[in-house]
Amino acid sequence: MATSAIQQSAFAGQTALKQSNELVCKIGAVGGGRVSMRRTVKSAPTSIWYGPDRPKYLGPFSDQIPSYLTGEFPGDYGWDTAGLSADPETFAKNRELEVIHCRWAMLGALGCVFPEILSKNGVKFGEAVWFKAGSQIFSEGGLDYLGNPNLIHAQSILAIWACQVVLMGFVEGYRVGGGPLGEGLDPIYPGGAFDPLGLADDPDAFAELKVKEIKNGRLAMFSMFGFFVQAIVTGKGPIENLFDHLADPVANNAWAYATNFVPGK
């Protein structure tokens, strides 16, 4: 009888949790208008990447993990030598900044390599190397998107600068200022219209995707740093540097360039 009671209690708890997780959106009338809101339901992920038994930054050789790093959030490997996450408010702010920079870095890394890949496969560009492409706007013909003047044709660096400042500055200022458009939404994972494929509908799958995003984003940030260094040292794009390394790994590697690099030459 006791076993039956425990099973019934567990089943009831699972049913309540499922109903709670399924209630993601709530439509209500506010001032005669309709406002779509997403309610974030926090449940303990079953993934190996969360909780006290999650993988640590040095595996079994990791030192004492700070008590405030409990494995609640994605990407927590228990490493915080500088104590940057000790304050909860600072931790929340840094988490948001990291995810935003991860997403920018992933887009940036794709933008650095994709034009070179297309160029090497026959697509004509004015300049496919990422750090040289912008200078095409100063050429006589201006800058054509994908080398096609019928798509986006830019000739004024001032117009490009104004668009960047006005459009991106406005959006970023709105985000930082906490505009009413995002009220009731998670600032990092808003869902709703920002998740048209419904990737976050399954809580366990969503927890896994958060980990994948942060891991790939951190890798992308390191990649972008590497692309910057490559541009300064070799004057070539990442794909061309890769081909050079594959052709002659001994002469074209980080150690060889570091020992022979002379600034300004």
Swiss-Prot record:
<feature type="binding site">
    <location>
        <position position="136"/>
    </location>
    <ligand>
        <name>chlorophyll a 3</name>
    </ligand>
</feature>
<dbReference type="GO" id="GO:0009523">
    <property type="term" value="C:photosystem II"/>
</dbReference>
<dbReference type="InterPro" id="IPR001344">
    <property type="entry name" value="Chloro_AB-bd_pln"/>
</dbReference>
<keyword id="KW-0150">Chloroplast</keyword>
<feature type="modified residue" description="Phosphothreonine">
    <location>
        <position position="40"/>
    </location>
</feature>
<keyword id="KW-0460">Magnesium</keyword>
<feature type="binding site">
    <location>
        <position position="181"/>
    </location>
    <ligand>
        <name>chlorophyll b 2</name>
    </ligand>
</feature>
<keyword id="KW-0793">Thylakoid</keyword>
<protein>
    <recommendedName>
        <fullName>Chlorophyll a-b binding protein 151, chloroplastic</fullName>
    </recommendedName>
</protein>
<feature type="binding site">
    <location>
        <position position="212"/>
    </location>
    <ligand>
        <name>chlorophyll a 5</name>
    </ligand>
</feature>
<keyword id="KW-0157">Chromophore</keyword>
<keyword id="KW-0812">Transmembrane</keyword>
<dbReference type="GO" id="GO:0009416">
    <property type="term" value="P:response to light stimulus"/>
</dbReference>
<feature type="binding site">
    <location>
        <position position="254"/>
    </location>
    <ligand>
        <name>chlorophyll a 6</name>
    </ligand>
</feature>
<feature type="binding site" description="axial binding residue">
    <location>
        <position position="152"/>
    </location>
    <ligand>
        <name>chlorophyll b 2</name>
    </ligand>
</feature>
<keyword id="KW-1133">Transmembrane helix</keyword>
<feature type="binding site">
    <location>
        <position position="218"/>
    </location>
    <ligand>
        <name>chlorophyll a 1</name>
    </ligand>
</feature>
<feature type="binding site">
    <location>
        <position position="85"/>
    </location>
    <ligand>
        <name>chlorophyll a 1</name>
    </ligand>
</feature>
<keyword id="KW-0809">Transit peptide</keyword>
<keyword id="KW-0472">Membrane</keyword>
<comment type="similarity">
    <text>Belongs to the light-harvesting chlorophyll a/b-binding (LHC) protein family.</text>
</comment>
<feature type="binding site" description="axial binding residue">
    <location>
        <position position="213"/>
    </location>
    <ligand>
        <name>chlorophyll a 3</name>
    </ligand>
</feature>
<feature type="binding site" description="axial binding residue">
    <location>
        <position position="172"/>
    </location>
    <ligand>
        <name>chlorophyll b 3</name>
    </ligand>
</feature>
<keyword id="KW-0603">Photosystem I</keyword>
<feature type="binding site">
    <location>
        <position position="103"/>
    </location>
    <ligand>
        <name>chlorophyll b 2</name>
    </ligand>
</feature>
<dbReference type="GO" id="GO:0016168">
    <property type="term" value="F:chlorophyll binding"/>
</dbReference>
<keyword id="KW-0148">Chlorophyll</keyword>
<keyword id="KW-0604">Photosystem II</keyword>
<keyword id="KW-0934">Plastid</keyword>
<feature type="transit peptide" description="Chloroplast">
    <location>
        <begin position="1"/>
        <end position="37"/>
    </location>
</feature>
<feature type="binding site">
    <location>
        <position position="79"/>
    </location>
    <ligand>
        <name>chlorophyll a 1</name>
    </ligand>
</feature>
<keyword id="KW-0602">Photosynthesis</keyword>
<keyword id="KW-0007">Acetylation</keyword>
<comment type="subunit">
    <text>The LHC complex consists of chlorophyll a-b binding proteins.</text>
</comment>
<keyword id="KW-0597">Phosphoprotein</keyword>
<dbReference type="Pfam" id="PF00504">
    <property type="entry name" value="Chloroa_b-bind"/>
</dbReference>
<dbReference type="GO" id="GO:0046872">
    <property type="term" value="F:metal ion binding"/>
</dbReference>
<feature type="binding site" description="axial binding residue">
    <location>
        <position position="230"/>
    </location>
    <ligand>
        <name>chlorophyll a 5</name>
    </ligand>
</feature>
<dbReference type="GO" id="GO:0009768">
    <property type="term" value="P:photosynthesis, light harvesting in photosystem I"/>
</dbReference>
<feature type="modified residue" description="N2-acetylarginine">
    <location>
        <position position="38"/>
    </location>
</feature>
<dbReference type="InterPro" id="IPR022796">
    <property type="entry name" value="Chloroa_b-bind"/>
</dbReference>
<feature type="binding site">
    <location>
        <position position="146"/>
    </location>
    <ligand>
        <name>chlorophyll a 3</name>
    </ligand>
</feature>
